């Protein structure tokens, strides 16, 4: 049987890892224009660049709404089930965004991202506090590093390596050309 110290360290590493995934919504600030360009060229020609800018605030707002729901689910069903739900919703988000070029369908994916963020964010923090009751601030800080570190890692990868490696400029209408915008998928 692993000791409490080993369980605490494993729980902290798991919480940090989950927040490395959940922090991906901050990356939308970087890729909004690419996403709008993708929709413009593929299925939603009348979309405006500004239409994509509601995504990140919406995900954050839904996350805040689902923080308390996630804690209630954790209290009733446990942290594993809560994190399973969080992982399931983020998986559904990625699948919807990968296989749909319809803006209205993608909105469901963004809703799922907010739900995932809300369910997973506080439940792992609360779980780690059981192992570190005298260091709650320290533990919370380590876990939340993952949230911010996600965009710190993903933004340059998305912008400079995957989507627009040559750093081409937008066309006169504000959108990127079809070759660049299709790199988002």
Mark where each language-model region is.
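Intracellular juxtamembrane helix-capping segments at the cytosolic ends
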Residues: 35, 117-140
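A gly/Pro-rich, aromatic-decorated transmembrane alpha-helix motif that marks the paired
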Residues: 68-69, 123, 140-175
């Amino acid at each position: 049987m692993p000791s409490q110290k080993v369980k605490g360290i494993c729980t902290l590493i798991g919480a940090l890892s989950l927040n490395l995934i959940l922090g991906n919504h901050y990356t939308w600030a970087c890729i909004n224009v690419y996403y709008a360009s993708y929709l413009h060229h593929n299925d939603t020609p009348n979309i405006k660049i500004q239409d994509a800018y509601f995504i990140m605030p919406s995900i954050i707002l839904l996350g805040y709404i689902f923080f308390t729901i996630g804690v209630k689910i954790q209290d009733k069903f446990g942290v594993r089930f809560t994190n399973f739900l969080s992982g399931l919703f983020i998986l559904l988000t990625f699948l919807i965004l990968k296989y749909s070029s319809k803006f209205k369908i993608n909105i469901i994916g963004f809703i799922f991202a907010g739900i995932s963020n809300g369910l997973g964010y506080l439940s792992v923090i609360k779980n780690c506090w059981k192992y570190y009751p005298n260091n709650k601030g320290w533990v919370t800080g380590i876990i939340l590093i993952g949230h911010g570190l996600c965009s710190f890692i993903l933004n340059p990868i998305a912008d400079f390596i995957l989507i627009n490696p040559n750093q081409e400029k937008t066309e006169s209408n504000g959108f990127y050309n079809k070759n660049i915008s299709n790199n988002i998928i």
